[in-house]
Amino acid sequence: MAVAIPNCGTYTVEMDYGASTNAFVLDSVTAGVLDSTDYFLEGTTDWQDVTAYVKQVSINRGRQNRFRDPTGQPSTAVIQIEDRDFRFSLVNEGSPYWNTAKGRLGFELNSGVRISRNGTYLFTGIITQYSQQIENPNRSLVTVNCSDALFTLNNSKTTYFTATPERSDTRIDTVLSNAGAFNKPGQRILETGVANLGNAPVDETASVLEYILRVNNSEQGRVWVDGSGNFNFDRRLVGELQDIDVTLSDTGGTAIPYTTFDIVSN
């Protein structure tokens, strides 16, 4: 259940343990029927609220150096779990999170994770490392390392195609579609770009993220995955170097007031 932290809000940590009651199953008489309205290819994610067992959570997002070009570094989260009854153990078949169909703990690599505050998601991603440290027969400490979906884009290759002349946002949309990434409705939030790209061929040597960063460098915009797990693209700042008139005055009115000023000539 959610945990309220004084003066900070109510936090919830949820993890997907791979169980689904409506996932498509090949050759199944009921769950393997094409065009079924009850069973779906990916199924419905079964999120488990594990907040009560969480000892510590840290989230890291954004560039460490704002003066460098974007590197596509994914946002990360680290969850530490106090596991006194070994329900998060990798070998405990009696765990409520044990996936009987797979014969292993449901929390595994690429399983989903999401962290929210007051109902707003701060982080949505996948497990990239899951480690268990047993300190004594009655205590176990589990560390779950997570990354957002930029991690998966970095591990996916672009498909070969000859791009048509188009804006930067349209090119990013095309590349994501070819990669089958962020395909659910509302998962792509793309501003209309300023840069117009040519019809150069897109090869298969670059990762999807690497190519998107090339497009972003042409735009001088921003790409990131938000707390809800949606892909965002912001176009370049327009008009930031335009002349702006500022009026200072000590007589009131709509001007910016001041008390003293210095004139320095070097």
Ranges and model annotations:
Residues 182-192, 217-232:
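Short, well-structured beta-strand/strand-turn elements
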Residues 235-241:
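Short edge-strand/loop segments of extracellular domains
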